[in-house]
Amino acid sequence: MGYVGNVSYPDTIPGQGNLVFEASFESGNLGRVDKVSCSEYDLFIRPDTLNNKYRVWFYFECKNASENQRAIFNIVNFSKQRTLFEMGIAAPVVKSNAQNSWARIPSRHIYYYRSSQHNDRWILSFAFIFESPDPVQFAYCIPYTYGQMQIWLNELESRKYPFFHRDLLVQTVQKRRVDLITIDATPDTFQGSKKMIFLTARVHPGESPSSHVMHGIIEFLVSKDDRAQKLRKVYCFKIIPMLNPDGVFLGNYRCSLMGHDLNRMWRTPSDWAHPSIYAVKNLLTQYDNNPQAQTVIYVDLHAHSQKPNCFLYGNVNMSAVEEKSTFRQLWLPHLLADLSEDYSLEFTQFNTDVEKAGTGRRTMGDLLSCLCYTLEVSFFSYRHTDSSGNGIQHCTPYLQYKYEALGEAFCRALLNFYEADCGLREIVLERPFKTFLPARAQKTLKKQARKVIQTVMMK
């Protein structure tokens, strides 16, 4: 295994109508281009650095088309075969100079199929009509780069908000910043009642939707909205908006510079190989052990390729056999479902899956005294019922504004959670906790309950 580079524009551009490709830019990913015909191209995703297992994220630019030239692009080497492309509710994104914002490619121009010409692999093909020779960019989902985040954080810092503070938590292996954002209207107040909310995102570099949601969260928290002002008074927010800057910069899908899935390193992180995970884990445990602070919630933001909508994953702990504890775990999912049409209680789940061991949610759930969740949002689309009252469901593509709107809805749900915690809001749950458990977790919970009962009887 080794690093495979991205394609670059040739030194000499051929005659107009001969497309040329470029991915040697921040977060770019396209390892090879094979010209099948004058209008069709096979495109090969570059694998993650030092890890050939992951080939999902792509982000490239092409130019030199003739006016109204048609082209078909085939992504031929996806490592993840089962995605929402198979269900017809997924679309890559495109951006041109004429329209300087990302848009979804129309579904009628997208095909996902098994190809006998490619060893019976699943191929994603999409057609596009170029309006001019100017560059056009294509990506798996709406990009959010490390450089883009740094420019935005610099701008936020320049506003001189008294409640906003930016620190360098640690540097990555390639010496990029891992930023720690603190948002708190009363930063000097630690008198036994300080409630803490911890948020992280982008441990998987290809999951750009999580950054757009985090962008929406932070922009709402620093806004003049009355609800944002109240949130800043009742909570201290500690936010790490990008856990894997090296992977994001390199255009990886899952891994860090060294080929590690950082979301499997939380149990025993290395201070030199996984510096962001090492530093964040220490930060979380430090505040959780501080008697003057009360850690309430930790949420790690991700993106999902095999399900639509957004939803939460939670943990099943020993305390989950207590009705009061399980009831409180369900508050945030229900509050978010009330505020956001794209939130799915159907996909919300509390699990103990072995393959999730070592993740932030599972590891910190074992170490911390607070509620720990993963917030997942689809790369592509969400299903929702229309307002006609007929129960008709529609599928709507996610665009940047909708990801950011989810961030705002999440903040509002946190405020409602605070009110419920203080007895100012009543939450009625129609579904018991066990209905949010997969079959395997239900068996685990029953075993835990029996052990608790046996322990009580022996006393």
UniProtKB/Swiss-Prot annotation:
Answer whether the UniProt record assigns the keyword Protease to this protein: yes
GO BP terms: namely: egg-laying behavior; protein deglutamylation; proteolysis
Its GO CC terms are: ciliary basal body; cytoplasm; microtubule cytoskeleton
Superkingdom: Eukaryota
Q: What class of enzyme is it?
A: hydrolase
Which UniProt keyword terms apply here?
Answer: Carboxypeptidase, Cytoplasm, Hydrolase, Metal-binding, Metalloprotease, Protease, Zinc
Q: Which residues bind Zn(2+)?
A: H204, E207, H302
Reactions catalysed: (L-glutamyl)(n+1)-gamma-L-glutamyl-L-glutamyl-[protein] + H2O = (L-glutamyl)(n)-gamma-L-glutamyl-L-glutamyl-[protein] + L-glutamate
Q: Where in the cell is it found?
A: Cytoplasm
Q: What is its EC number?
A: 3.4.17.-
- According to the entry, every stretch annotated as the Peptidase M14 domain falls at 142-418
Pfam family, any one: Pepdidase_M14_N
> Where does tissue-level expression of this protein occur?
Expressed in labial and amphid neurons.
What's this protein's family per the entry?
Belongs to the peptidase M14 family.
Protein known as? Cytosolic carboxypeptidase 6
